């Protein structure tokens, strides 16, 4: 490796690390990976504000920033630029280069509400790039947008499948094997955004890019504020880029890994969830005129469990899905659907089956509108930070998990609809938290309270980010678009993303599409290769006819999987 820091005759500073090299000149720095220049980053980063009218106020540099200091110590070089802008009295840009990565930050001084951060936007034309394609670890709803995108196209992902995703891009260049990775890293309490976008700007004969967040006015500055950092490094491939991103979150102390003590046996499954059974029983004469959510009832689930016995199938966990409760906000069993939920749970315990309840986040059904927030689209959402809602959560969690008289004695939750997280400048929460941070606070509260009531309770949820690793027992791979015909490959890819984000967290392989026989059975029979097998229905449909032999085949796979888990757990113990 070349000398770590060199200065050329023309005043350029060159830092050479094992996976990358930067060349600092003026207010820009070239980034090289595998001896190829991937981009030239302009340190100027716009930090627009939100006006009282809830509109964006542009942030413009009034002069070029000047390189004020270059400091070297063992294994690290720090470059500091100083500038100012139309909105901020002072802006300080810092680039720290180490052996493993570089770390870039912008600190603003002044007053105002941050609308977003436009990293490397320069004077508005972005930063020049040579890479040709990018990868984002987030697939959009129903795969309308892929993980990969052309460098000439903007990339914004709003996903219901990974909430939140890892905020990291890796970029590839034609003819070069290695990749450049640029990831967003926020300190604890500073994830007050929803998105991390890649944007392209055409300028004259060229084009540039920048990276953007959406604080939407929910970060108030009265003095100084340092925006979330960008870390950069070279990577061998897409997975390597994400692994390094996750490693930084853990080793920096921002994120905590999951406690890897031996998990309760029932966490490993197999599992049965009734959601698609509810969907396919709509119109069934046995449940005349009942909607899909009205079918989350005792008669259907009792019949489902009885049908399991006929196939000699023995799940360790049963998930009662949407909508077993009277109201989403208060989570009390609907007496018109459940004569005695506790008695149902007790019967399952006697059979070795642990009952989990589907739990909808954010929905204001049954909650006081005065304690809710309104999105920019005019939709109402629960504010989970109010004392009133936290007290309501305490009551609901106790009622669901406790074995005390009058409680349900259930064994965990399937937390869903995390993507309902309220978005927009109009959202005003009691705590002032927003975006990822607001979701984190709610999920952390649920997790800690649940474990206090029942330490073995299983929390199944959807985050695909290391920040959430210690409050997620089992990550759900989520819905599969039945129009597709690659069930195994789709969910296998998601499984890789979740495992990279939260090492050691169990994977709920979730549902098959029940779209065609081949696509469905490929995934059902191979789920154990990825995670915990999960079956969503014990019947087929006209598009996907399933026979008794099919379910007996799944039963055989379940038995072999269960034996394997028991053997492995025996070896661990």
What is the predicted role of each segment?
Residues 4-8, 13-316, 412:
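Carbohydrate-recognition beta-sandwich/jelly-roll modules
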Residues 247-250, 292-307, 336-343, 390-395, ...:
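Well-ordered, non-membrane alpha-helical segments in soluble/globular domains
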Residues 253-279, 319, 339-378, 456-461, ...:
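Glycine-rich, aromatic-flanked loop segments that form ligand/cofactor-binding clefts
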Residues 273-298, 323-339, 375-395, 423-439, ...:
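The substrate-binding groove and active-site-proximal loops of carbohydrate-active enzymes
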Residues 282-299, 341-346, 353-408, 419, ...:
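Active-site-adjacent "subsite" loops/lids of carbohydrate-active enzymes
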Residues 312-324, 393-429:
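Active-site groove signature of glycoside hydrolases
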Residues 365-379, 383-391, 395, 440-552, ...:
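Glycan-recognition surfaces
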Residues 573:
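Carbohydrate-binding surface patches
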